[in-house]
Amino acid sequence: METDVTSDTVEVLPQHKFDLRSLEAYLNQHLPGFGSDSRAVLTVTQYRSGQSNPTFFLQKGSQAYVLRKKPPGSLLPKAHKIDREFKIQKALFSIGFPVAKPLLYCRDASVIGTEFYVMEHVQGRIFRDFSIPGVSSAERAAIYVSVAETLAWLHSLDIRSLKLDKYGTGVGYCKRQVSTWTKQYQASAHQSIPAMDQLSTWLMKNLPDSDSEECLVHGDFKLDNIVFHPKECRVIAVLDWELSTFGHPLTDLAHLSLFYYWPRTLPMINRGSHIPENTGIPLMEELISIYCHRRGIDPNLPNWNFFMALSFFKLAGISQGVYRRYLMGNNSSEDSFLTANTVQPLAETGLQLSKRTLRTTPPQADAKSQLFAQSRRGQEVLTRVKQFMKQHVFPAEKEVAEYYAQSGNSAEKWGHPLVIEKLKEMAKAEGLWNLFLPAVSGLSQVDYALIAEETGKCFFAPDVFNCQAPDTGNMEVLHLYGSEQQKKQWLEPLLRGDITSVFCMTEPNVSSSDATNIECTIQRDGGGYIVNGKKWWSSGAGNPKCKIAIVLGRTESPSASRHRQHSMILVPMDTPGVELIRPLSVFGYMDNMHGGHWEVHFNHVRVPASNLILGEGRGFEISQGRLGPGRIHHCMRTVGLAERILQIMCDRAVQREAFKKKLYEHEVVAHWIAKSRIAIEEIRLLTLKAAHSIDTLGSASARKEIAMIKVAAPKAVCKIADWAIQVHGGAGVSQDYPLANMYAIIRTLRLADGPDEVHLSAIAKMELQDQARRLTARM
């Protein structure tokens, strides 16, 4: 059915061979025009793609046809009803809907062994790959628009006018689908797949309230079941109506949208969330919008996760049935055996989607992101993060605060309350996990910067999305510089959230603002290294899940420069000689939530040589790669925290009175509010510019911008927090409000990753160098 039929057909499979002379004799007698050229020879080839009902291309002289038949052998009940295909195509063709013209139906199984029907061959283009290679972005977009509009047309048909009596029940379609595909799967299963059983149970318990909606549904509506005009982006035939009936229209729309969530473990296509920008392929929300506009319905579709989960469940059931026919020897395609490995990942994807809240309208771009544009995926993920924060994270703040208030004197204070662990599982199921790492999330630094701002509004939110420091920086180190063994042993469990980590750099006995002062040693000893030294401000070391430390220490080489004297090495926390000495308070706060900030001693700690990261003398090189994106994350979380502080300040200013006036009516308070808004906008833009520079130029070329935000953001937000405390009076420094804790968190950022003064000196040096280059260029 493509322009080049030979590329899509093969010799008839042995199990599907039939009597050609019998077929030819029957068609000569019953199909008008078939025998017009008595000298022409009938040739028959089989389509590769027919996995359910075998499909054949018939050629006789200038005449071309397509034959569909039932597969031979024992069949599942109510499956392979090709008479229904013929009936629906005949009805649709009569009203001008794009289908191949049905020509005849044969119920006499003696002709070729089973019932069959013949239709016209439609000459056109069929795209087997959802990315539609070989066409322009504009044409690709037009093709998808045509697909969505054709589906909307189908669902808008008046089913009564089609005169398809008893073609389908309609009402209760979703429930019947779950029941039918559960039975079909169970009848053909060759092994136990728990995800299929769990998904079946979930679907039956979460049927949509709108299950009474009915229209004509295709049942397998997807790109490779559509024939397009040879030159135009126009649908000229929709194929394969085997599963058509009266049912819920969103089942078709969800089936069309499968590729957006396709499991990466399956080789057919890549996961749609990583569809490249500017390819013309619409976002799922855009595709839905086109469909809904054509039908005149609201694009905010309820229960979308149900319909997506049902589509994956159904496809998993179909795949299981195809494999069963392969085992029985009556498969319709030579590669049917491959479907055995698709059932489980399809079911697991459906189960994951069942736990997610899926939006069906395009995200509205925030005005603050327009100067440094987000990707389409960045907009979509940010919208979902905001929704998740509103629905789940902010409502949990009180419970989390009470947990740490009550566990202050127990060992549990360094761990997480159950509610955070539940939120983490929910975020992972929603796909809102490891968003900070571009290679995993597909997000740019600008994309993630805006997400970091949102998570900065709640002190435990980064942990919910597995985007907390210092783990983000440590995971970046392992991703960029770790060996395959190091990634497998430590990066993978960190990415899963099974463990946490600590970064050990700062030392109590030296001025660590000059990192070359570091005294901790990493000495080669036979087949390993021995680590000796004292570290402090090792954040997260007290977390019960903290299993690995990245330690910066000296591996002196007399011939190397002062910045090639240090290395980084992995030290498991349970290695003999690793000792947690004491937690360090910050303005009296222990920062239990993040596992505290600890003094850690390494006393003759021996680790294998394979634990060294990248090589001896590469420590500062790794640090620069680690700290660039990390400072973006810190500063944008600070922007988010500033927004929260300003909100608290404004609430207080509106509610309280002093000297017979609301606080905001006092000019000094009004000015604090105004200056706060100005400062927030300034540091947001400066940080987004730094993120944009990393995206476009790389971390090395963005050093000045990164240093500037590291100075500007914490300093500005400290001032905003101070104003907010003033507005609250004594309450501002009490436990009744979070402002004192917020101030403590922000104030430490003026020291973390280097004090302001170090960054200011670096900025001045880079500025003078830039000015000198400009002067030289002018001369």
From Swiss-Prot:
Pathway: Lipid metabolism; fatty acid beta-oxidation. Its cofactor is FAD. It holds the Pfam family Acyl-CoA_dh_M. Substrate binds at residues 513, 628-631, 754. GO terms for molecular function: acyl-CoA dehydrogenase activity; flavin adenine dinucleotide binding. The modification Phosphoserine is found at residue 210. Its EC number is 1.3.8.-. Its main location: other. CDD domains: ACAD10_11_N-like, ACAD_FadE2. InterPro entries: ACAD10_11_N, Acyl-CoA_dehydrogenase, Acyl-CoA_Oxase/DH_mid-dom, Acyl-CoA_Oxase/DH_mid-dom_sf, AcylCo_DH-like_C, AcylCo_DH/oxidase_C, AcylCoA_DH/ox_N, AcylCoA_DH/ox_N_sf. One of its GO terms (cellular component) is mitochondrion. Transmembrane segments: none annotated. It comes from the Eukaryota. Acyl-CoA dehydrogenase, that exhibits maximal activity towards saturated C22-CoA. Probably participates in beta-oxydation and energy production but could also play a role in the metabolism of specific fatty acids to control fatty acids composition of cellular lipids in brain. Homodimer. Belongs to the acyl-CoA dehydrogenase family. This is Acyl-CoA dehydrogenase family member 11. The gene is Acad11.
